Curated annotation (Swiss-Prot):
Pfam families with a match to the protein in the record: YcgL
HAMAP family, per the entry: UPF0745
PROSITE patterns membership: YCGL
Domain YcgL: start-end pairs: 1-81
Gene3D superfamilies found in the cross-reference section: YcgL domain
Top-level taxon of origin: Bacteria
InterPro entries per record: YcgL-like_sf (IPR038068), YcgL_dom (IPR027354)
Name used for this protein in its record: YcgL domain-containing protein Tgr7_3126
């Protein structure tokens, strides 16, 4: 599946994956408000075998099929300074 990744200008390390380029209508209004204006970052072919830095590719694919988007939040800092 071809995916399109956008980063948030308001929330560091927060990304939205879309199944269709610039299809922001699938994103719920409250999430749009918090996320802010999306900035296009990357386009790539996502398969279950592909390695992603912070996400399970099968979970991302399932979310894209079910909702049309996938939200990637920043990793939790398990040991804050």
């Amino acid at each position: 599946m071809q995916v399109y990744v956008y980063k948030s200008r308001r929330k560091p390390d927060t990304y939205i994956y879309l199944a269709r380029k610039d299809d922001f209508e699938v994103i719920p209004a409250p999430l749009k408000q918090v996320f802010g204006t999306p900035e296009f970052t990357l386009e790539f072919e996502l398969t279950p075998e592909r390695t992603l830095a912070q996400e399970d590719p099968e979970s991302v694919l399932a979310s894209l099929r079910e909702r049309g988007f996938h939200l990637q939040m920043p990793p939790q800092n398990e040991r804050p300074l």
